[in-house]
From Swiss-Prot:
The lineage of its organism: Eukaryota, Viridiplantae, Streptophyta, Embryophyta, Tracheophyta. There is a cross-link at residue 940 (Glycyl lysine isopeptide (Lys-Gly) (interchain with G-Cter in ubiquitin)). One of its GO terms (molecular function) is inositol-1,4,5-trisphosphate 5-phosphatase activity. This is Type I inositol polyphosphate 5-phosphatase 13. Residues 782-798 are annotated as: Catalytic 1. The gene is IP5P13. It comes from the Eukaryota. It is an enzyme of class 3 (hydrolase). Expressed in young seedlings and flowers. Highly expressed in anther and pollen grains, but not in pistils. Not detected in maturated roots, stems and rosette leaves. Residues 1124-1136 have a biased composition (Basic and acidic residues).
């Protein structure tokens, strides 16, 4: 090999150069060395590394089947007797069903159970038929396996009172909420893979990936923005569009056009019904409603003409605020838009700044940064990424020409320590790079009281007033905020940790729970639910009453129906571990080890150690890890060779692998269970040379099997007889710090429009607090298997004595001398985990290519044989005799634990362990149906839903308002309820031109019930306290017709619209948690006395008396508004 090989002696010498705790001055002895009848072996132990009580690691949201995990609950203490340390302590675990029935070779083996498994992160996770730690939910779309969603991931959602729409990578889909509790189509149904248990839905034709959605309920349209720069309109009522009986045909868009050169990041509809969209390069465009309306009236076969009509009407705001080449807004990407319907403004959100625009005049009002400071100039230089240090590029292995020649140890030490230092520097540099990222805005929402709330990557939530003044900061969770939504007087926050939090309007925390096992990327309210979408594509509906009495009723009722939706499946798992000593194996050796025992196996996990070693390789591996690269040609050779032995072309399918320096783990699943296996994630934790190099450490794979989570971890722990405490510390370090990579999920997050920096922000850049942050990924799994070269040796025994006992196959006494068993017995390592009875000879150390038990090391060192290569695991059993059910979903037993003594290619023997696992899981389609039956029939639940229909009694000061030019009238809304707040918002149900012949006018709504341009209403939404009132200004603003735009240029701006017009205002009233509303109708009429007035130039300031017009004398009201003395049609309401 080209790289330098580190032999065991050299490794020991190098270890003395590593900054680790010094050796003790006096010899110390572990409990395992007490009462030895043979020659005492001194244990030159390192100082015991203390285990920290807590660990600020990435928030754990991986919760098994994504709905049964809870971090709370009591677990039965470990069954192992810790007081009797000297006796054989093996426990026969209750065999799962269908095991050992008349077939002796499948009888479960006795197992030893380690102490200390009943507390902290080593506690068995709590499971239940219905999650005990969060509100029950409607599983509209259960978590699909990631592998089934390639090219089809859900990106975003939008909701109305009757439908939920979702944007996908390949189109649009929607659910009718009246069908939300219906059964899915099941496996083999006419639905794509991953949607077998999804409630009935409808899909569109294939489109470019969907970036954003907005619902226009006034015109029954759903608008979508796409990655190809197009905006599409979809009819909400697809039944009226379809002309055949086949409801499964994909539906088509009503109209579409090319809106941007880049992806359409966000769409909103302003208070005046115009559509605003944004994209890269700071581009914001407005699409006037009048043009959109005309395009929608064209026939489907005229869609090209409709697209051209809309495209030519665009108003580019960036060009309008650019003067002499200087733009008032930044050229960075506009990520979000927010329509402030209270004050008729639009907020445009860039990463570190906001711009606020007037929705009516389209003027730029203010530009401010995320700290609330007003910025006076745009086009700020983009933030430059930190450059990699030159030494990172050049100094992994190079030495100065002036240096004296160095020996092997010094050169190896320089290379490896240089790489370790590089890893630490990159980690520190990355933390600095994230310091700016943590301020970036990731979400924005308008609350019912008119305040604006924004969330950042750091978890900071900021409240703003409508003018961009920063009011308060709150921070209840130190993970990135990804989305908001509001319902009533509550604000819902979705985090990258999978948490949902509920806040009041003062920012105080009401409730919090883990909603998904992956980031919550979108929230939407409608139909009495708060719907959440996770990056994996799962959609859940949370009742708006949660947390509340409804939760306990549903949880109790649904738990009692467990037998109706509980299912069980069995799977056999083969685990193989081998320290290959930098060699390669023949096909016959691999067949002997693995291929010969896989006929009944569903999953195969293989771990190799010392695939490659040497200072050069370790340094290169560390360098590659810092830039996200892993693996090697030798590692790939091993994966291919093992795959060939498993017949992966016909029988097994390779799921994934992970390599860290010399450590390699890979996993295969049998093809006939492939539809139930997926969501593979990877992890690596280095433990060698300052916890930075992978010559020692662990690599892991996490996978979902029948909706349960299994973790497989391949380890290579510290070497040498005396390093027991270092081995214990290595295990503790791996168990606590193993965070499974979202490497495969990053593509999902990007597809979903989630900021990569938000998604990858880790605990080393953002502090973590609270018990919810302490759980590790491994602690949250249903089954965890550790295997590898653990390096625990036999103590208190000589080489010759060990050889004698081995030759006599007297393993009972040798097991008493096993360091690992002694450490597990006192709860120092592998706490609460189990190992089958060892009945094979020690697997280390052998002379290569020498068969039989005579092959043990006979060289000068004569290393004492030892069981270095082991397989240890835990499942969800809290006692040795648990049965598989939804409270204990994974029950496993070992039916084979062997070493392949005939394989001689390495100084270690390969070990294999076969498990039989019984897995209990939920049929989520059936459970959703049972939930629907409970919701429709339970009297207490129906009573709670009826209470949600309560709306406070309110009144308005008038139902008719008449305005003339520049008039302002006060509309008073009064809340007559003595106890309840009333939430109001004012929309325009339609506008019309008054006909001269007295016929009824045709009222047409603008986009999203927007106001006509001649009318201003302020405030258009808000909260009215009990027995209080609010004054709303209804103001007429002279409007010059600017409806027709060609390439953004007004074509007839010199004409004033002189026709009398009417608008119907809808004053909608809700309670603080109402699912229904009441509406007051107010007719507003504008009378124009002068019929025609042609002006040569558009006036900058409108005069009170236009030429030829007749004006009434006016009064100045206490609010500064004007009102004709002779007009009695409006009654001023009393202000309170």
């Amino acid at each position: 090999m080209d790289s330098l090989i580190i032999e065991e002696e050299d490794e020991e010498a190098l270890a003395t150069l590593v900054p680790v705790p010094p050796r003790r001055k006096t010899h110390s002895y572990s409990l395992q060395f007490d009462h030895k009848p043979h020659h005492q072996i001194r244990k030159h132990s390192l100082d015991e590394v203390p285990r920290s009580a807590t660990l600020a690691s990435e928030a754990v949201y991986f919760d098994s089947s994504d709905d049964e995990f809870s971090t709370g609950g009591n677990i039965t203490e470990n069954a192992a007797d810790e007081t009797n340390a000297g006796a054989e302590e093996y426990t026969i675990v209750n065999p799962p069903p269908n095991v050992g029935l008349g077939d002796d070779d499948t009888e479960p083996l006795p197992e030893f159970i380690g102490a200390g498994g009943g507390s902290g992160i080593f506690k068995v996770p709590v499971r239940a038929a219905v999650h005990p730690g969060r509100p029950p939910c409607l599983e509209l779309r259960p978590h699909p396996l990631r592998e089934t969603q390639t090219g089809r991931f859900l990106r975003n959602i939008a909701c109305t009172e009757t439908q939920l729409w979702a944007g996908q990578e390949n189109g649009i889909r929607f659910w009718n909420l009246e069908d939300a509790y219906e059964a899915g189509c099941g496996i083999g149904g006419q639905v794509p893979r991953g949607d077998e248990d999804t409630a009935p839905f409808h899909e569109s034709v294939t489109t470019s990936p969907t970036m954003c959605l907005v619902a226009d309920q006034s015109n029954k349209l759903l608008w979508s923005g796409h990655k190809d720069g197009k905006i599409r309109a979809w009819k909400m009522d697809q039944s009226s569009v379809s002309h055949d009986d086949d409801d499964s045909d994909p539906f088509k868009e009503r109209v579409s056009w090319l809106a941007h050169r880049g992806p359409v990041n966000s769409i909103v509809i302003s208070s005046y019904g115009d559509m605003w969209s944004c994209s890269e390069g700071g581009v914001i465009k407005i699409w006037p409603w009048d043009t959109l309306e005309k395009s929608l009236l064209l026939k489907p076969e005229e869609k090209h003409m409709a697209a051209l009509l809309v495209e030519r009407s665009a108003i580019d705001l960036r060009s309008q605020v650019t003067v002499n080449g200087t733009c008032s807004i930044s050229s960075s990407e506009v990520k979000f838009l927010l329509a402030d319907s209270v004050r008729a403004k639009v907020w445009a959100v860039q990463s570190l700044s906001f711009s606020i625009w007037d929705a009516r005049s389209k003027d730029l009002l203010k530009v401010l940064n995320v700290d609330g400071q007003v910025e006076n100039r745009g086009d700020l230089p983009p933030i430059q990424d930190q450059q990699v240090d030159d030494e990172m590029k050049l100094k992994f292995f190079s030495a100065s020409k002036r240096e004296k020649p160095q020996g092997f140890l010094q050169r190896s030490r320089n290379a490896i320590m240089g790489a370790a230092g590089a890893v630490r520097r990159v980690a520190t540099r990355s933390a600095g790079a994230f310091s700016e990222d943590t301020r970036k805005t990731e979400a924005i929402v308008l609350a019912v009281d008119g305040t604006i709330w924004t969330g950042s990557i750091s978890g900071l939530i900021v409240q703003w007033d409508g003018n961009g003044n920063r009011l308060r900061d709150v921070n209840h969770h130190h993970r990135p905020v990804l989305c908001f939504c509001t319902f009533g007087d509550r604000i819902y926050v979705g985090y990258a940790s999978g948490y949902i939090q509920v806040l009041d309007l003062d920012g105080k925390l009401i409730s919090s729970w883990v909603s998904h096992n992956e980031p919550v990327i979108k929230l939407a309210a409608g139909g009495g639910f708060i719907f959440s979408l996770a990056t994996h594509g799962g959609v859940r509906g949370w009742y708006v009453t949660s947390p509340g009495p409804l939760d306990n009723i549903i949880r109790t009722e649904l738990s009692q129906k467990e037998t109706l939706y509980a299912r069980q499946d069995n799977v056999r798992i083969l685990i193989g571990t081998w320290n290959v000593g930098q060699g390669r194996a023949s096909h016959d050796a691999l067949m002997s080890w693995l291929g010969s025992v896989t006929s009944d196996v569903g999953i195969v996990a293989v771990g190799l150690q010392e695939v490659e070693m040497g200072a050069g390789f370790l340094a290169m591996s560390a360098a590659k890890e810092t830039v996200g690269l892993e693996g090697s040609a030798v590692g790939q050779w091993w994966i291919d060779a093992i795959g060939k032995a498993l017949d992966e072309k016909n029988t097994f399918e390779r799921m994934g692998s992970r390599q860290l320096a010399g450590l390699l783990i890979s996993l295969w699943a049998r093809k006939d269970i492939r539809t139930h296996v997926g969501d593979l994630d990877v992890a690596a934790v280095p433990c060698g040379f300052g916890r930075a190099i992978g010559n020692k450490g662990g690599v892991g794979l996490r996978i979902r099997v029948y909706d349960r989570i299994m973790c497989f971890v391949n380890c290579h722990l510290a070497a040498h007889l005396e390093a027991v405490n270092r081995r214990n510390a290595d295990f503790n370090h791996i168990f606590r710090l193993m965070v499974f990579s979202r490497g495969q999920n990053l593509s999902n997050a990007a597809a979903a429009g989630v900021s990569t920096s938000a998604y990858t922000t880790k605990s080393n850049t953002i502090p973590s607090t609270g018990a919810e942050e302490i759980k590790s990924d491994l602690a949250a799994a249903d089954m965890v298997a550790f295997f590898g070269d653990f390096n625990y040796r036999l103590f208190g025994i000589t080489y010759d004595e060990a050889r004698d006992f081995i030759s006599q196959r007297s393993f009972d006494w040798l097991r008493e001398r096993d360091q690992l068993r002694a450490e597990m017995k006192v709860g120092k390592v592998f706490q609460g985990m189990r190992e089958a009875l060892i009945t094979f000879p020690p697997t280390y150390k052998f002379e290569r290519n020498r068969s039989g038990l005579g092959g043990y090391d006979s060289g000068e060192k004569k290393r004492i044989p030892a069981w270095c290569d082991r397989v240890i695991y835990r499942d969800t059993q809290s006692s040795p005799f648990s049965e598989s059910n939804l409270q204990c979903p994974v029950v496993s037993s070992v039916i084979m634990y062997e070493a392949c003594m005939d394989v001689t290619e390495s100084d270690h023997k390969p070990v294999r362990c076969k498990f039989h696992a019984t897995i209990a899981h939920v049929d989520k389609s059936v459970r959703r149906q049972e939930l629907g039956k409970i919701i429709r029939s339970n009297e207490k639940i129906l009573s709670i839903f009826e209470d949600l229909r309560f709306v406070p009694e309110t009144s308005v000061s008038t139902n008719n308002i008449v305005l003339q030019s520049q008039d302002t009238v006060i509309l008073t809304i009064t809340n007559n309820s003595p106890t309840s707040q009333a939430i109001f918002n004012i929309l325009c149900g339609g506008q019309a031109v008054v006909k001269d012949d007295g016929e009824d006018a045709d009222y047409n709504p603008r986009g999203s019930f927007g106001l006509p341009r001649w009318l201003e209403v302020s405030p258009a939404a808000g909260i009215i306290n009990p027995e209080g009132s609010v004054d709303v200004k209804v103001h007429h603003e002279d409007f010059y017709s600017m409806e027709e735009y060609v390439d953004g240029i007004p074509q007839n701006w010199w004409c004033e619209d002189t026709r009398d017009k009417e608008a119907i205002l809808m004053v909608n009233i809700r309670g603080s948690c109402s699912t229904t509303l009441r509406s007051h109708s107010v007719k507003v009429r504008h009378c124009f006395s002068a019929r025609v007035c042609l002006l040569e130039n558009r006036p900058t300031n409108l005069t009170k008396n236009l030429g030829g017009s007749r004006r009434y004398p006016t009064d100045i009201t206490r609010n500064g508004s004007t009102r004709p003395r002779t007009e009695d049609s409006v009654r001023r309401g009393k202000s309170r």
